[in-house]
């Protein structure tokens, strides 16, 4: 969240009188509250310039001084940050509903995206309906098991693409594996939702959709001055809403084409089989606690969000896990040995192998502990004035859960900064939101609804990569010289993408 000074100072000069009036009124209103502790910050700007490019790390450092709950003022936005497993448990167990609303970023005003979004929808009946239909139609165990052939096809293609890229690469140089994991995840969702490959560069419409979705992810991950000074929204100083409107518009336009194609297929009776798009098109509800029918706009946004949520998290998580294994050759040797002993020669990695690979499961848990795909869970917002751990949290306060700091909480984890998959062997700790020191996908009512499918795909992709290839670092790169800095966006990817040399096992 590194802010560009020119935007902020220009904004302040234009509306300084409004700032003064606004803050004087706000401070008078809130002077009686007992807020959590936090650094004092600058007039007007608050703490926004103290956080750097990896704010989750800076906030974790502040935990040592201010404790498990941190209070910040980011421009005109009051923010509470939850930073320990104890505070996380208190929030999700005892205050989940009070903190169940979402902050709506300004870029998500484009094409009224927020109105059909499951991730940032207000807590209420429509959100509950969305979550219910996703769970029943895509993410229950039976449905996920039925999608194994789709995952198999997409991962097989990924392995072919990697081998082809490696064969054409200059000797001693590496390739970016995460790009191929992203493509495989994108195609998996394309097949489950729309019954087509969407990372197919031979298809013009698929290629355009893929590019538009990549750009939407990019604009969503840039810190926006309009979100910390909401009364600047109409100026769109960074042109982020304009860019989002352009690329969201392109994605929506292509989705309209997909819907039209599906309508024609249904009329002709040439459908390949029922997918999630059919479920949405055929839905008929009561009109009470759920819509009687989904509008075309709601269907488009519903589908777009599935792609946005399900691709970056999988590819970044696999990249971090492979990075940690390359940094720790002894762990790489252990997981490779486990896989070779569990799977007979000349057989591909399969879904059913995952349960027989406890060390590989531990590797992914440990990597997710150290590198959660969203270092801050999607920001929450208080529905009402709330007492939390003895502090006052006013209605409409932004609430950040620092999953990165919680995964490194020394009161929860022994030697928290070290990569030790062995800590999970024989342990019942998992990432499903019941162990509050390990919440890479959230917890409570608003935890990631797609976790069951995404979690399966992470294991399947990583296991297949380890089964099919031996992995080496490029010339001049040693395990300890790998840059472990993250980049702050929709997800916390490696700042420098991992480059590796795959050799057919």
Swiss-Prot record:
UniProt keyword Metal-binding present: yes
Residues the entry annotates as binding heme: 448
Keyword Iron appears in the UniProt entry: yes
GO function terms (MF aspect): heme binding; iron ion binding; monooxygenase activity; oxidoreductase activity, acting on paired donors, with incorporation or reduction of molecular oxygen
Requisite cofactors: heme
InterPro entries: Cyt_P450 (IPR001128), Cyt_P450_CS (IPR017972), Cyt_P450_E_grp-I (IPR002401), Cyt_P450_sf (IPR036396)
Gene3D superfamilies to which the protein is assigned, alphabetical: Cytochrome P450
The EC number(s) this enzyme carries: 1.14.-.-
Keyword entries, A-Z: Heme, Iron, Metal-binding, Monooxygenase, Oxidoreductase
Family: Belongs to the cytochrome P450 family.
Stored PANTHER family: CYTOCHROME P450 76A2-LIKE, CYTOCHROME P450, FAMILY 76, SUBFAMILY C, POLYPEPTIDE 5-RELATED
Identification of the protein by name: Cytochrome P450 76A2
Species name: Solanum melongena
Classification lineage: Eukaryota, Viridiplantae, Streptophyta, Embryophyta, Tracheophyta
